Curated annotation (Swiss-Prot):
Keyword Cytoplasm: yes
Function of the protein: Responsible for the release of ribosomes from messenger RNA at the termination of protein biosynthesis. May increase the efficiency of translation by recycling ribosomes from one round of translation to another.
Classification via NCBIfam families: frr (TIGR00496)
Keywords: Cytoplasm, Protein biosynthesis
Domain of life per record: Bacteria
Protein name: Ribosome-recycling factor
Organism field: Aster yellows witches'-broom phytoplasma (strain AYWB)
Any one GO molecular-function label of the UniProt entry: ribosomal large subunit binding
UniProt KW Protein biosynthesis keyword: yes
Amino acid sequence: MQQFAKDILASLEIKMTQAQELMLKNFCDIRTGTANPNILDKITVNYYGATTFLKTLASISVSEGNQINIKPYDSNLIPNIKKVLLASNLGITPQTDGVVVRLVFPKPTEERRKALMKEVEQLSEKTKVAIRNVRREGNDKIKKVELTKDLETFYLNQIQTLTDKNIKLIDKQTATKNIELSKA
């Protein structure tokens, strides 16, 4: 039974880490005025009848810190890429010179920065709720396992320690993202 409790603890740790990683991935989607090529990861282009990820059809690079350059391997794709980027809700109008498609990210206004910080806080809070739900799930499983009262208390304390550690880490990552946004 004690091994089962250890397995529950390991499972909870994995779930909490996954929730935290999802939050960090969502943080990457929040634009800070600096160019991040990861925002193009989900963009697909129609390439000779097949839907293909943009990153496989073009060389993507960052220049000047606030500009993404997309140089397709086949220059005939430029109109398709431009059309897809316009429809992608990135909030940026692509510019092209016939060889390269450019996305220029403007610095956010003070009002926009505050809205982005609010979004970061909401993502952070959702992640904390997810971690607390994982904790509750773990506590319920531990209570169902037939353990001595001392062992049950020990594992419940372990779960709480794991939860506290993850919540502190989320707070730290949120503060870092907010600092990044305030400097943008």
